[in-house]
Swiss-Prot record:
Heterodimer of an alpha subunit and a beta subunit. PSII is composed of 1 copy each of membrane proteins PsbA, PsbB, PsbC, PsbD, PsbE, PsbF, PsbH, PsbI, PsbJ, PsbK, PsbL, PsbM, PsbT, PsbX, PsbY, PsbZ, Psb30/Ycf12, peripheral proteins PsbO, CyanoQ (PsbQ), PsbU, PsbV and a large number of cofactors. It forms dimeric complexes. With its partner (PsbF) binds heme. PSII binds additional chlorophylls, carotenoids and specific lipids. Its main location: membrane. The gene is psbE. The keyword Iron applies. Belongs to the PsbE/PsbF family. The keyword DNA damage does not apply. This is Cytochrome b559 subunit alpha. Keywords: Electron transport, Heme, Iron, Membrane, Metal-binding, Photosynthesis, Photosystem II, Thylakoid, Transmembrane, Transmembrane helix, Transport. This b-type cytochrome is tightly associated with the reaction center of photosystem II (PSII). PSII is a light-driven water:plastoquinone oxidoreductase that uses light energy to abstract electrons from H(2)O, generating O(2) and a proton gradient subsequently used for ATP formation. It consists of a core antenna complex that captures photons, and an electron transfer chain that converts photonic excitation into a charge separation. The chain crosses the membrane at residues 21-35. One of its GO terms (biological process) is photosynthetic electron transport chain. It comes from Rippkaea orientalis (strain PCC 8801 / RF-1). It holds the Pfam family Cytochrom_B559.
Amino acid sequence: MSGSTGERPFSDIVTSIRYWVIHSITIPMLFIAGWLFVSTGLAYDVFGTPRPDQYFTQERQELPIISDRYKASQQIQEFNK
């Protein structure tokens, strides 16, 4: 016979009203926070990725592909011009 860890069974937690009161608020808030994080553009600033309209400029319409791994930093500087 296995010992008890003293934790509540998962079925008791999921069927409790307190669980659903807390999670009916927090789960939708997580989705709203994620949507705001992306829709305001903060995700682009935090992770340093270019916005969709910054991938191709008027001067550069080709794909910015690194072809030489040893001169990668030089190629990136050329792409950013």
